[in-house]
């Protein structure tokens, strides 16, 4: 058990180097810093809004706007496609983490605060925070019981509200950020929309709290814990599989060589000679490594949970599980495979 947790901690350190160490060595972080200092968005003549909150947070928000601008401006299809692919996995993994936070043994632990981890992932990187959360989850697990046996009946109502709170708290700010600026320029700018989106975990938490208060009268009604958990799991799996299938389908069927070349190769994070040619290229490598390490870690955690429940698996069962994971990764990506495994073994 401890070995899996230590391995996940190593992946968190690897994520830190793949994101920031590699970004420093290939010049991406320097490009971001220069763009922020010049108060100009990369590749455009549009000035960077430097006074959004009037506090020290403006420097952080300014750098985040610089990063996300090429993702959203529509001029870099490979980068936008990777972001779309990643977006579904982000929703799926945080739905799963929220469900896990309602496990009875974790109610008074650090894992009870998924909003904190989600905000840290926004500021640091998913490749750093998700492996860290997975390691803490393994250390704090008091029993191998499936989650449907560990969740109280009252908590099942809260779990049932997680998909709705994600749609409202994550979906609405995301739509506002993705819409062309011409559709809302009289209300707010694209840069403001990017800044507002950054704290989506807080919106999700507020929506979830509000819905729980609103539907408090229904808490006494009977609800199947398994039904609530599987509903949340099904929502997470759909969020993972659709962007995965669409992004890879477009890459493999439309066959624009420049787009396919952007999506397929993985630049080695340890290489010190490769240099980014633009903010878009650096952002693509950033998202690729963030996606790979973050979601790969989550899959390893899900497999650990599966093996913990099935403590007497035979060699053939282990081979079958490995084959199943491979097929699921092809169909839905590593995050979708993790969600499926957890749902299948009633971990949700």
UniProtKB/Swiss-Prot annotation:
It is an enzyme of class 5 (isomerase). Pathway: Mycotoxin biosynthesis. It is found in: Membrane. Its EC number is 5.4.99.-. GO terms for cellular component: membrane. Coiled coil: none annotated. Belongs to the membrane-bound ascI terpene cyclase family. This is Terpene cyclase ctvD. It comes from Aspergillus terreus (strain NIH 2624 / FGSC A1156). The lineage of its organism: Eukaryota, Fungi, Dikarya, Ascomycota, Pezizomycotina.
């Amino acid at each position: 058990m401890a070995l899996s947790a230590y391995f996940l901690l190593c992946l968190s350190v690897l994520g830190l180097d793949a994101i920031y160490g590699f970004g420093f060595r290939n010049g991406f972080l320097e490009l971001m810093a220069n763009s922020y200092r010049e108060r100009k968005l990369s590749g455009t003549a549009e000035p960077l809004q430097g006074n959004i909150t009037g506090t020290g947070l403006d420097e952080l928000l300014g750098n985040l706007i610089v990063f996300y601008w090429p993702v959203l401006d529509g001029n870099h299809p490979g980068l936008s496609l990777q972001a779309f692919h990643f977006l579904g996995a982000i929703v799926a993994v945080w739905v799963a983490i929220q469900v896990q936070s309602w496990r009875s043994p974790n109610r008074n632990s650090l894992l009870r605060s998924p909003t904190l981890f989600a905000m840290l992932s926004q500021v640091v990187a998913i490749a750093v925070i998700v492996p860290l959360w997975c390691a803490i989850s393994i250390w704090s697990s008091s029993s191998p019981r499936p989650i449907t046996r560990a969740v109280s009946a009252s908590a099942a109502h809260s779990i049932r509200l997680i998909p709705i709170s994600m749609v409202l708290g994550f979906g609405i700010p995301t739509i506002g950020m993705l819409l062309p600026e011409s559709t809302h320029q009289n209300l707010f700018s694209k840069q403001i929309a990017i800044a507002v989106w950054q704290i989506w975990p807080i919106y999700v938490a507020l929506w979830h709290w509000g819905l729980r208060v609103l539907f408090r009268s229904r808490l006494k009604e009977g609800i199947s814990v398994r039904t609530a958990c599987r509903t949340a799991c099904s929502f997470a799996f759909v969020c993972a599989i659709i962007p995965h299938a669409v992004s890879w389908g477009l890459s493999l069927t439309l066959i624009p060589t420049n787009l396919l070349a952007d999506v397929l190769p993985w630049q080695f994070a340890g290489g010190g000679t490769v240099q980014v040619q633009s903010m878009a290229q650096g952002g693509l490598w950033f998202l690729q490594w963030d996606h790979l390490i973050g979601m790969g870690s989550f899959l390893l955690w899900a497999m650990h949970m599966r093996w913990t429940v099935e403590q007497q698996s035979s060699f053939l069962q282990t081979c079958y599980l490995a084959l199943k994971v491979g097929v699921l990764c092809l169909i839905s990506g590593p995050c979708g495979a993790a969600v499926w495994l957890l749902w299948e073994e009633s971990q949700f």
